[in-house]
Amino acid sequence: MQRKQHPLVSPATGTQRHVVSWHYGQPDSTGPHVYLQASLHADELPGMLVLQHLKTQLDAAEAAGRLTGRVTVVPVANPIGLDQTLMYAQLGRFELGSGKNFNRHYPNLAA
């Protein structure tokens, strides 16, 4: 398993944000490649929980040599939305600055 951090544009000096992906199987595998992500709408937590659980199963499968392809897991596809709260309520569906839906508006956030 390989963990990768993909940097995002920083909202303020001295801060950092990343999307984290977990990669299972051999990178040069010619077998199937499955990509799984959760929480593009960051307030949708069940998918995050499922992928966290799946990661432990993939760890075991990889250690036992049972993976014939590759699997990429991104449990939190929207760390910006996950960090947005207002009066103790998580508001991960819409960007607070513009009010735009994260699943309809895709700003370039790559650093």
Predicted features along the sequence, with ranges:
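Structured catalytic-domain cores with a bias toward divalent-metal coordination
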Residues: M1-A111
